[in-house]
Amino acid sequence: MQIKALSVSEINHYIKRIMINDPILSNVYIKGEISNYKLHSSGHIYFTLKDEKSRVSSVMFKTNTEQLKFLPEEGMQVLCRGYISLYERGGLYQFYVDHMEAAGVGALYLAYQQLKEKLEKQGYFDGKFKKEIPLIPRKIAVVTSPTGAAVRDIISVIKRRFPHVEIYLFPVLVQGDRAAPSIARAVELLNLFGGIDVAIIGRGGGSIEELWPFNEETVAEAIFSSQVPIISAVGHETDFTIADFVADLRAPTPSVAAERVVPDVKEVVERLNTLKDRLNKTLVKSIDAKRNQLGIIKSNYYFKNPLNMIYDRQQHLDILMKDLTRNINVKNSLYSNNVHRLGERLNSVSPLSVFSRGYALAENKKGERIKTISNVKLKESITVQLIDGQLSCEVTNILKEDKLVGKNQI
């Protein structure tokens, strides 16, 4: 009897067909903990699902990872849907995941928390980046659904409070998968529109799924990058979205946003009237003060006789000139006396004064002064400086210790 043997590839392919055609393995939900999580450069993620006793290798391809509302992490409990099949080349069976959500905590809530933490670390919520809302805007952009109650509330409140402001509606989708790109694009357009002073972005309340576009990163980036100040007005008072944290001002509802974006024209008029009255009173008070000051000046003696003031100043100037001249003469006399005394002191220590008393100064040929008889020799030529000239002399005798030393004496 001849035994028919299968190749490794054939047996793996056969097992794979069995798995694919199995009604349970072809569409199965598995709950477990993520382990050995790896995000490949291709966008695929590879991980292991495990519990206390077992584990299964798993993969989720890029086309499915792009639909995730949160970022899977090591140790996270998840509920995955997919199918079991064999990786023929390695002979290993794998769980091919096409849907994943966080177990216990909703996937949307987890995604919300993750994005909030990420943007907060990047400074998106920092107050130093918040732009000031203009006090009285002229042009207001409204980014919302053109058919919802929010747009009617916003326009109604703005027109009631400040009728002359211009409102520009940028219609967008406010829920669904296409809403986030629609909102982000509208923010870009209102910045390109030109002349917009402030924008309101919002919608009425709803579930977390309905409000989710305002939790998308693309919307947060558009709001953060906007040069036009943004007021967010999403949902009800208790609803906080990522857009609320990034926006320059958060309003709990669209109606409140409309109230905050413009002042009440009646209050503005009252305020202007109050300022007008205050300005008039201040001007009257200032004019009265200046009038009194002018009256005092006009009653002044010199104002009535201006030439007398000139004469008085001239007389005062003459007195000052006399005092100045006298002081200069006194100083000159003092300095002259000082110079004379210093000159006398200088003359007293001058060599010339020594000469005038009959003394002389002797030097050898080198110009060295002769201070003692030990500095000269017999027959040495020396120069003697007198008060009125010099003498060239030859030493013929040296008197030492009261004795005359002659040429024959040593």
UniProtKB/Swiss-Prot annotation:
It catalyses: Exonucleolytic cleavage in either 5'- to 3'- or 3'- to 5'-direction to yield nucleoside 5'-phosphates. Bidirectionally degrades single-stranded DNA into large acid-insoluble oligonucleotides, which are then degraded further into small acid-soluble oligonucleotides. PANTHER family: EXODEOXYRIBONUCLEASE 7 LARGE SUBUNIT. InterPro entries: Exonuc_VII_L, Exonuc_VII_lsu_C, OB-fold_nuc-bd_dom. GO terms for biological process: DNA catabolic process. It comes from Alkaliphilus metalliredigens (strain QYMF). This is Exodeoxyribonuclease 7 large subunit. Belongs to the XseA family. Keywords: Cytoplasm, Exonuclease, Hydrolase, Nuclease. One of its GO terms (molecular function) is nucleic acid binding. The keyword Manganese does not apply. One of its GO terms (cellular component) is cytoplasm. Heterooligomer composed of large and small subunits. Its EC number is 3.1.11.6. It is found in: Cytoplasm.
